[in-house]
Amino acid sequence: MAMVSNVKYFADALQGTQGKVGTFTVLGENVFFKRGDGTDTVCGLEMVAGRILRARSDVHFCEPKYFVEMDDGEKVCSFELLDCKPLGSMAPGRKGKKSVGSVTQYLSGLYQTFAAAAAAHSVGVVHSDLHTGNVMLCPEPVSHYVYNLGGGEMLSLETNGVRAVVVDLGMARIPGKNTVACDIFVHVGHVVNGRPDYAADVRTLTLGSCYDMVMMCASGKPSLEERMLCYEVMAAYNNLFAGVCAPSKGGWFVDHYPSMCAVMEATIPDSVASRGGGSWLLAVANMCKLLVPRPYVKRACGKEKAHAMWMTLFTELGLTAKKSISKVDMVDAVQRLRAIADGSEIPPASLMKAACAVGLLTASVAEACYEKVEEIKASHVGMLRWKDALDAWVRLPVRCSGSVPKLGSTVILHTESGTEETVVTQSMLRQIVKTREALDMAQAASDAVWTDTAYYEADDELMKGAHEESAEDFATSFLKGGTTGPIAKRCRLILKSL
């Protein structure tokens, strides 16, 4: 166990709902840490997701450091400590916020975040909480980032002195059927350990950044030219989401989705729930669910039978005889089930049977919620021709991504295998300019459809036709550029689907 010192928690206003955060020193290094409540799976998930994404891009994702055991025996995750400010706080003119950045820096950070999300989506990771408070902007001396997508497609972004780093992966969805994660955020459309929902990241990022840009423009502080850049990005958002239902007043789609937590809580008998509270019992349910292979299957189960399953599990865990269940009891129960799930403990047959029964019940509820979420999302985005962050990124106005790098200048090059510092060659510059020109023409062709058919929103058939025409014009125009990378492949798929 590594010794920690100088433990400092952040102010309450900076604490999230997924655990306490702060800094401490471990092995002589000052790092950022997060600790859960002892019954969740946030820290384990955060470290696994962090390692996957760090290998994909060491520029846009934090370096995971250590799993550390605190004095009370609880394990916490830690990451490199950044010199940074949240993207949301860099928006000049935000009400109640001290201006610390410029519009160009904000837009550079925003575009970099789309690039980071595209990198995550390419390896099957969904952040699931990608608002502008979970994007940090750090100083960046290099003037440009270049993203080599392959097939002659290269995108460049002017950094304007900032580097976007995506943080807080505690709600992420990562590939693999056995990941230690939970489904407690189904009610906001997050299917954490199930089907990847790349569109959720795009939706959350666009909603948050749109609010930032509206507030910037309303403040009157940015110049007219800067406000025009914001207007162009927001117009692109409008075209992306034309036809999608509106979110709730809080900016979420909360009201539209079922709550797995609420459904599971209804299966727990009062005699059990009253002695421990709902959150840790949901953690117990999710640990049991890890014993169930995917794909999950819906099963009919009456209330009395479900209550009996919980009572049997409590008996096997030795909790039935206790008059009150302490925090230590809760943590021990979850940790034991975690050990059973990962194979480090072989339990008595009776406990395994009881845990599997609750696991099957939880899996059934999860699958029912998944199906409803998928059904609702299909109705929300059924007409959209984009699927993930790369689809959305290439539809953002290229003019707002800044200048192209100069020949011979030093840039950071992003590829599928990682990042490296390199010098801009004539061949690289040619590919950057060619890709940018092709995107500029494709965006103009697509935007023209929405400009000419704004009144179609009142008619579903006309709206569907406008979506198809916009997608067709974008794809047809881009393919004239002659590239063969992922953007071109997606364009061909669009045309094939029409």
From Swiss-Prot:
InterPro entries: Kinase-like_dom_sf (IPR011009)
GO molecular function ontology, one term from the record: transferase activity
Superkingdom field: Viruses
Keyword list, A-Z: Transferase
Protein's recorded name: Putative phosphotransferase 057R
